């Protein structure tokens, strides 16, 4: 019976991280599930669901050489896993405004209170050092009518934070 784990690896971005990690997993007959891998700042981060007939300590030992040679940190959590458990998002929220403390907390808090569930969030700071602009894109799902979600972020718009909520067309298949 396979055990499911969430692996989180992070280290300074360099060539070959994904190849080395996935090769080590392949050599131990570990099944890869969903994954998110991206560069943030100068670092590369991997979050990956895996299934294996190994305990967490053996899985950690299987990755030890790669972790050490690539200068990575590794965190392993046991989880209830499975493949093909996708939720199809129905809304996208785009946010921009002068970079200031609390934008993420305020927008996501208002959306959550209105019944919006975040599936993916990406953010960046654009503009210049003198005039930074915070940009955020949120993909999620909600059964709350669009008008109610719009009302939930109305105060932020009045403060100069641009928040656009629109239906998301998702092609499946």
Feature-to-residue mapping (PLM):
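A conserved regulatory-domain signal marking ACT and ACT-like small-molecule sensing domains
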Residues: 1-173
């Amino acid at each position: 019976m396979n055990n499911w784990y969430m692996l989180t690896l992070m280290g300074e971005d360099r060539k070959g991280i994904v190849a080395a990690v996935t090769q080590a997993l392949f050599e131990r007959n570990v099944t890869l599930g969903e994954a998110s891998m991206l560069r943030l700042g100068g670092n590369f981060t991997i979050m990956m669901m895996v299934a294996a007939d190994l305990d967490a300590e053996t899985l950690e030992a299987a990755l030890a050489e790669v972790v050490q040679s690539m200068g990575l940190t590794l965190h392993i959590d046991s989880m209830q896993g499975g493949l093909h458990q996708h939720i199809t998002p129905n809304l996208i929220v785009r946010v921009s405004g002068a970079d200031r403390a609390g934008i993420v907390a305020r927008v996501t808090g208002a959306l959550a209170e209105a019944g919006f569930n975040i599936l993916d969030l990406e953010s960046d700071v654009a503009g210049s050092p003198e005039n930074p602009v915070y940009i955020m894109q949120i993909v999620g799902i909600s059964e709350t009518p669009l008008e109610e979600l719009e009302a939930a972020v109305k105060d932020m718009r009045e403060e100069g934070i641009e928040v656009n909520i629109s239906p998301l067309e998702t092609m499946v298949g």
